[in-house]
Amino acid sequence: TNLYGCNAAKAADIDGDGDVDIFASVFLPYIRKETPGSEFTESLIWMEQVEPGRFERYSLEKMTCFHPTLDLGDFDNDGDVDLVVGNMTMAKRKEDTLAHWAVLWKNKRR
């Protein structure tokens, strides 16, 4: 699959079905909210493996392409895999940054 500007990707069994799924994030700091077409630019996706070697793509976020890193782990200690995404928080233009250094996406599966 194509993900323009993909800067980080991690694999784990995110949905608890025994196979490996993928999260991927985008870092394109020059894409701004006022850039034509930016509202369609995916910045965070989940690739669910539905059968061996076949993935379904889910867009979790668009138009926020300021993620230089991501990681997976059980950050809330509930037994499933959560996602934390690092954000660019310093730039020349305040509107080209995100407010928080990192954002935790809790897995609501349990």
Name each model-derived stretch.
Residues T1-R110:
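Beta-propeller-forming repeat regions
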